[in-house]
């Protein structure tokens, strides 16, 4: 078994808890931002955050047996901004005064994990989602081994298959997502505090394309089309054969055809265009990366850069428990 961490999720989750200790209830937002700036620049407080990151990291890994490799992926500026200027605008238009210090601390965490020998994957133009997908292909199709992705990003559920599962180690709820056929197996594998849920990964993708996502600035295909309507749509198209090895346009046509029939829409071209846009923004599939073959500074496409990153890092670490001793964790020194 191999494990991939969504590094941004892991960092944000831990940071949100750590940051509460350095804010005051009666302070203004501006005052609390300044307090966070000071905390992120303080060497001792940086060490507290780094130790917490390592402890949470180990706690997640130690729930699994016979782990071979552990990788961590971290975001860079997304290629999707070239596609849509306002991509994730709602999330990025306001950045706290501590933003640069936050990124600096993320870089410190990244460098520390690299020094410890873990695979740390970061590619210009690629979001963590993109790298999670590319690494999942390597672990499951090249090595033909099981993979668990540790993340709180529900979008990643669209790549779940018989060999890929998802573990959400939220501080409030521990959830594990897998194909329905492996629910019993994983239920017996875990302690009782982990909730196991079987999901249909293809329908996860359909939901995002049809229902949209305001956090990613992805519009809904039809106003007033709610969850109840989506469930009826799934019933309407069932039974269906999931399209395999198709282009972005072919997948968009498959969805648009059925959506227009279900809604009795006559605006097929408009619906098709919107489905195509939504697919390009959300679908984790090689077809997307091939179709939009953006060139980067080194003259290579994003896909080639991601594949090169896998080839460069795939052999860098063989995981043997425990990854860190207590001395490693509490001796983590930020210079």
Where are these regions (language model features)?
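Extended two-metal-dependent nuclease catalytic cores across DNA- and RNA-processing enzymes
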Residues: 67, 93-332
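Domain-level signal for Mg2+-assisted phosphodiester chemistry and nucleotide/NA-binding surfaces
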Residues: 1-114
């Amino acid at each position: 078994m191999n494990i991939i961490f969504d590094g941004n999720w892991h960092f944000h989750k831990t940071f949100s808890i750590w940051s509460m200790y350095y804010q005051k209830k009666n302070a203004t937002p501006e005052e609390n931002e300044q307090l966070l700036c000071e905390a992120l620049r303080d060497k001792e407080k940086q060490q507290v955050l780094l130790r917490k990151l390592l402890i949470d990291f180990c706690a997640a890994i130690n729930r699994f047996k016979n782990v071979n490799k552990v990788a961590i992926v971290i975001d860079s500026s997304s290629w999707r901004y070239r596609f849509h200027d306002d991509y994730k605008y709602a999330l990025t238009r306001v950045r706290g005064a501590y933003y640069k210090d936050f990124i600096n601390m993320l870089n410190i965490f990244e460098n520390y994990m690299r020094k410890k020998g873990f695979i740390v994957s970061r590619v210009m133009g690629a979001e963590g989602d993109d790298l999670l997908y590319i690494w999942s292909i390597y672990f499951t199709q090249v090595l033909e081994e099981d993979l668990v992705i540790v993340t709180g990003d529900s979008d990643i559920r669209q790549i779940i298959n018989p060999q890929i599962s998802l573990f959400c180690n939220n501080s409030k709820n521990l959830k594990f997502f897998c194909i329905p056929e492996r629910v019993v197996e994983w239920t017996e594998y875990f302690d009782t505090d982990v909730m196991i849920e079987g999901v249909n990964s293809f329908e996860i993708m359909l939901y995002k394309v049809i229902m949209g996502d305001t956090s990613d600035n992805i519009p809904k295909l039809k106003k007033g089309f709610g969850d109840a309507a989506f469930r009826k749509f799934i019933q309407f198209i069932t039974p269906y054969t999931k399209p395999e090895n198709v282009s972005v346009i072919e997948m968009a046509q498959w969805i648009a055809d059925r959506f227009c029939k279900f809604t009795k829409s006559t605006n097929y071209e408009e619906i098709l265009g919107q489905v195509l846009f939504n697919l390009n923004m959300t679908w984790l599939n090689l077809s997307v990366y091939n179709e939009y073959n953006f060139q980067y500074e080194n003259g290579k496409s994003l896909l080639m850069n991601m594949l090169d990153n896998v080839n460069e890092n795939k052999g860098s670490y063989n995981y043997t428990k425990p990854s860190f001793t207590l001395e490693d964790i509490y001796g983590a020194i930020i210079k």
